[in-house]
Structure formats: C-alpha cells, structure tokens
C-alpha cells in the first residue's frame, strides 16, 4: 500500500439557464459545466519494475471535463387531454492533462493531451492485390506475422517512414470508449 494516498480532488463550475415561454408551455433548461480533477489514483509507468511486482498506486493523474446539458419540455392541452413531450441531450468531452507515462519516440503516441480511453491503431491503406505489390522493394516490412503477406492482406501506412509497419505506426483513431453524447 501507499500511506501517502489522498482523496481525488475536483473543482467544478456550472452555469445554468432555465426559462419558460408561451405561457409556460415550453420550458428549457441548460447547464454548461467545466470540471478539473487532479490527484487521480493511477499506477506509475515511469518507474521500472525490477522484481515483477506491481507498484502501489499514486495520486498523480489530472483531467479536464467540459460540456453542456439541454432539456426541452412542451406541455399543452388538446380538448380535455393534457400531454407533454420532453427531450434532452448532453455533450461532454474530457482531456487527460497528465498521465504518468514513459516518453514515447513520437508525440502522436502519447495519451496525455488526448481523450480518456482513446483508441490507437494502424491506418488502413487498402489491400495487397497482387504478389508484385507484396514483393515490391519499397514496401514497408511488417513486424507481425513474420512479414508473410499474401494478396488480400491489409496494407497499412508507415506513419513514421522507417520502412516498417510496427507499434510506432499506431496513431490515435476514432472516438474514445467514453461517449460524448
């Protein structure tokens, strides 16, 4: 255990606006929020593990989260029937401000500065259609599957231009696993 652990801290700012229109038949509620969190409990990645044991967690992460919420309601009456319709939506985007991570060879591989849960992967560049494409001298060498490619296999972009398709070519892609809407 780590005797220096503390509670995670959060600083939040919310600004809301509620209003009614058309004799209170239409009501709208909006909230804009900004949250900064630090002392997030996380494992260290920059200290070597010599004996194979997991190191204790530390309070060392920080993150920003911001967005809005919108709620719209329509209340009315047709004859003797009262009805209401309601819709809501929200949008939130987070950014990892600090994560204890080993410096990567290329900045595009860092998780700090990206959304929490960001996926990384290779950029698809079509398929190998013939043996001539596979046997071309200028084709990047694949670090996987012993570089044994066949027509129909996927082609990937050599992002760092080192002549190899490997983990150094993985870039942030798509959305994170944390929904925004």
Q: Where do the model's predicted regions map?
A:
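C-terminal substrate/ligand-recognition segments
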Residues: 180-181
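Conserved small-residue
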Residues: 77-176
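A short local loop/turn or secondary-structure capping micro-motif enriched for an aromatic residue
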Residues: 37-38, 175-177
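Extracellular/periplasmic, surface-exposed regions of secreted and cell-surface proteins
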Residues: 1-121
């Amino acid at each position: 255990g780590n005797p220096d652990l503390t509670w995670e801290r959060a600083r939040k700012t919310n600004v809301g606006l509620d209003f009614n229109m058309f004799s209170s038949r239409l009501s709208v509620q909006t909230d804009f929020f900004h949250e900064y969190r630090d002392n997030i409990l996380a494992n260290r990645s920059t200290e070597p593990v010599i004996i194979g044991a997991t190191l204790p967690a530390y309070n060392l992460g920080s993150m920003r989260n911001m967005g809005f919420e919108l709620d719209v309601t329509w209340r009315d009456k047709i004859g003797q029937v009262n009805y209401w319709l309601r819709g809501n939506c929200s949008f939130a985007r987070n950014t990892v401000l600090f994560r204890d991570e080993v410096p990567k060879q290329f900045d595009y591989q860092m998780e700090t500065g990206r959304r929490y849960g960001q996926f990384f992967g290779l950029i698809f560049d079509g398929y190998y259609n013939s043996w001539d494409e596979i046997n071309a001298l200028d084709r990047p060498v694949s670090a996987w599957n012993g570089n044994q490619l066949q027509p129909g296999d996927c082609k990937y972009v050599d992002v760092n231009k080192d002549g190899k398709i490997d983990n150094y070519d993985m870039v942030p892609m798509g959305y994170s696993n944390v929904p925004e809407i």
